[in-house]
Amino acid sequence: MMVGFPGKFRRYIMEEYIVNKGKNETIEVDGINYQRLCIKTHIITDKDSIVDVAVKYAKPLIKENDTLFITEKIVGCCQGRAIPLSEIKPRKLATFLSKFVLKTPYGIGLAMPETMEMALREVGTIKILFAAGISAFGKVLGQRGWFYKIAGEKARAIDGPCDCTIPPYNECVSLAPLNPDEVATEVSNAIGCDVIITDINDLGGNILGASSPKIDRDLFVKILKDNPLGQSDEQTPMGIVRVC
């Protein structure tokens, strides 16, 4: 059954799954078609367990050979790693460095003093400064992306609020989840399928955690490259990848 929602909130519901507006349900990768079936949940907070959330919303929908993908932000939120802006006091260095970060419509990243401050704390001042220097050299050569290659996944996963962020996270900085492989394994044991923790946005992404070393992370980056969970107020922090 398909049901339409009015205006910018229009989505299509097929059974218990959601295909978010502007996203395709299926994608072809290396000659194989995959469904990306998003799952709507309540607003997750640090009072929730990601395992309990997955058991409640995803487990009843899982079929054989499915893979559950979970956004890293919601895992971090469950771990208490959504830090209120009011609790972050950026140092002068954070304010200075944030001015050189490219702002995009897909997320503020480290382009605000508070997110850069958290990058300095999470990754270390020396490493961030080294990454910034390498990035500046890369830009002279016409190359982008060198900063995150040096700073690493912890820095890449940090994000700040934007106009469409769901409260209370519209006033928080989101940090990378701790121990994503272990989290993926714990969820997998609870729901009975492969699980990955993703850091995907409308510019690309990474797989931060996987429940098995046999999972092809590069393949799932291709399958999820158009960010089917969305980048706005969709409230779909997890989904199922299923071979058609």
PLM region descriptions:
Residues 9-244:
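N-terminal and secondary-structure boundary signal
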